[in-house]
Amino acid sequence: MTALSSVRRKRTSLILGLNVLALVAVAALGLMGVTALRHYEGAKKLEPPDTRAFPTSVVGMLAIADDTNRLAGLALVVSLPGDQAGGYLLPVPTSVDSTLGTGDERIALTAVYAQDGVEGLALAVEGVLSVTLNSSQLVTPAEAEALLAPVAPVQAQLPRDVRDTVDDAAVVLFPAGATELDAAQIVQVLTAEVVGELESARRDNINAVWTAIATAVGVGKTEWIAGTPVTTVTDLVTRAFAGTVISQSFPTIPIAAELNPAGLDVEQIDRAEAVMWLATVAPGSMSAPGLGLTYRVEAPPGYVEQLKAAVGALLLIGANVKSVDFNGPVLSVSRALLTREEEREFVISDNVEFGTLEVGVDTQPYEGVDVVLQLGSEYLDRALPTPTTTTTTASTTTSTTSTTSTSTSTTTAP
């Protein structure tokens, strides 16, 4: 079996494992009258006429290898919808577990790349984040420098010293604090690693540099003509750098020792948050690996954490989240708008978490969506559970109508 074949086999096992976990979660939550299989059968019926399509975005994976061919950096680049210039930079932790906790083995994305190369890495990223990539590209430090040259220099605020291993010794490349970085220095920060240290020790500085890149782009640094084909990640970066760019990092969750007996440098992605942001900026690219129904989730401005909790609750029962809208209607109780009336009993059972639920039929359903879940104040105004995720950047959450700020300052919901 080839290395790539092993990745496909692992990815299939991952999806099957997620569905098994979803079925167990359903039973644990007492939802005995609903089965994931019946959800699946309902969700796969023919699309009703006159559905609304989501705007099309281009999603690419940019991987950076250091001089030893170690996976040193990873980010998703997402275009704005349609033919707009600009986009999103979404750094992905390279230590994320590609198995999402299924099986006996924890396999970091760094290990996937080392074994299966960039194609295997792309498959793993798609599985972890439930997103479909249009393209993927691996660049060397020199190639990364050329790619980032149009935005350099950048003004970065480094949370900690940038350290690297030089001649078997740890040295400080850049001290913590404000600093100006040219393109070569940007790549140094993105690839620097002290041998033996955890990947998470690098993350604050990596996220800070991606934020600095987004800020440096301003209203555009490159030339891009609307309608120009985007066939490579290089094309996508050029398009993104031609307009306003937003950076958003993904937090991680420590893996319990009993699930990582080998003590590997592996973390779990905060999947609820990652899916929430991706379903916000690239709904047309979201996949549906779960056997349950596929949702669009809406909430009015100001409820980012509550919306994340709702996404997490849906993922737990094996549902899929394709779209998220932070500018939903203000309602007293939550409302579920069905694409098909026959899904009513399943939706009511699925959504006991959200309290009183008004159920109706969506007269303008979205393509690929079974249910539009509009969260009401009865659910949104409840006290949130104590956070269990760990993040590597300090951020404050607010809401506006259409923009999302960088991950190291204020996070604003689109």
Descriptions of predicted regions:
Residues 2-400, 410-414:
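Non-catalytic, solvent-exposed segments at the cell envelope interface
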